[in-house]
């Protein structure tokens, strides 16, 4: 793996040193492991792990701390994404699920369902289909109006008429309001693949915005006070010609008070990019161009120095953590968390209650789920 020249490979000069992690296996046999979500599913104050595996017919969760396996629902096919949030206030989240996925939209059922428990989340949940939108691919809950009530954001991979993902058609972003569950279009401005979405209160006004990452680059979607969605380009992503252009997954972090945007680029790409704003323009810096089939990116302050690290997982295979080397986020150092984890997805949460953020990742070709215990900064 080649790191670009401005990435430092020496001892961390600023902030706390890199963190030590201890790896723990939660589960194996998760064929086509694709997503892990960290959420308290049984209202006991401990964060559990939901594992979605596209090659399985069961959606399962593992109960913290012993990681006992429970089946949420079965007889499912081609599951691709889920999101969890307690919409009725009973302390146990509801789950929205996208299934029936195929890479080519004309072969994708695009089933969107709502899953609710029947009183005991350790038993089977009710599954209610609410929509079919071909190529439904990413789901997130978002409080778009600051009311405290969230809606479901659904991002298909491509236009429903696309024969291949590379077709240059407009790709919609839609939403569902709990209760009515009627599909509402947010935008159809994107072209080609839109692979990732990220929910963030971008401007600190108490309302969530949406970041999208796709062939068209990285864009911010914000609902105005008069109910109109506004779309703003943050960056174009990889400048290569179509369809090797744009972005794939996106996350937001901070180095001190300074915000940055982290991305995997292009689609399922080989690059980890950091964007920093200067004079209204988001400047692109590729800090690693040696990953393979990049598929997940997150930020968190693992060592408590006030500077978020970047976690990048790739199915090619590996999980890396990048540490800022200065107070501006201009220089970064890479450490390898796990060279044997073909991470399709990771999640960040305090899984053992010690106040430190831990990492969980699910492997695609290895069909396993692991969590990485944050042991604190290494001694120097």
Regions found by a protein language model. Name each.
Residues 3-13:
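Sec-dependent N-terminal signal peptides
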């Amino acid at each position: 793996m080649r790191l670009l020249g401005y990435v430092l490979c020496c001892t961390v000069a600023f902030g706390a040193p890199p963190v030590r992690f201890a790896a723990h296996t939660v589960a194996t046999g998760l064929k086509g492991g694709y997503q892990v979500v960290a959420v308290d599913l049984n209202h006991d104050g401990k964060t559990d792990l939901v594992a979605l595996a596209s090659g399985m017919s069961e959606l399962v969760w593992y109960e913290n701390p012993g990681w006992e396996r429970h089946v949420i629902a079965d007889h499912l096919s081609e599951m691709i994404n889920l999101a969890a949030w307690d919409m009725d206030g009973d302390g146990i989240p509801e789950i929205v699920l996208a299934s029936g996925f195929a890479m080519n939209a004309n072969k994708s059922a695009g089933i969107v369902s709502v899953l609710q428990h029947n009183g005991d989340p350790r038993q089977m949940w009710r599954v209610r289909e609410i929509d079919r939108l071909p190529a439904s691919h990413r789901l997130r809950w978002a409080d778009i109006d600051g009311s405290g009530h969230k809606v479901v954001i659904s991002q298909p991979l491509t236009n429903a008429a696309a024969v291949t993902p590379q077709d240059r058609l407009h790709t919609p972003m839609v939403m569902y309001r709990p209760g009515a569950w009627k599909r509402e279009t947010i935008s159809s401005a994107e072209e080609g693949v839109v692979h990732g979405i990220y929910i963030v209160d971008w401007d600190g006004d108490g309302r969530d915005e949406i970041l999208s990452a796709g062939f068209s680059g990285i864009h911010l979607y914000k609902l105005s006070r008069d109910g109109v969605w506004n779309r703003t380009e943050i960056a174009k992503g990889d400048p290569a010609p179509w369809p090797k252009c744009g972005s794939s997954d996106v996350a937001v972090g901070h180095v001190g008070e300074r915000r940055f945007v982290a991305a995997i680029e292009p689609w399922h790409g080989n690059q980890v990019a950091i964007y920093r704003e200067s004079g209204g323009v988001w400047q692109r810096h590729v800090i690693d161009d040696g990953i393979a089939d990049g598929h997940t990116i997150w930020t968190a302050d693992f060592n408590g120095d006030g500077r978020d690290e970047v976690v990048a997982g790739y199915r090619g295979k590996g999980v890396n953590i990048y540490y800022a080397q200065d107070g501006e986020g201009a220089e970064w150092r890479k450490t390898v968390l796990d060279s044997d984890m073909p991470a399709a997805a990771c999640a960040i949460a305090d899984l053992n209650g010690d106040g430190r953020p831990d990492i969980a990742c699910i492997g695609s070709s290895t069909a396993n789920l692991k969590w990485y215990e944050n042991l604190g900064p290494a001694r120097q």
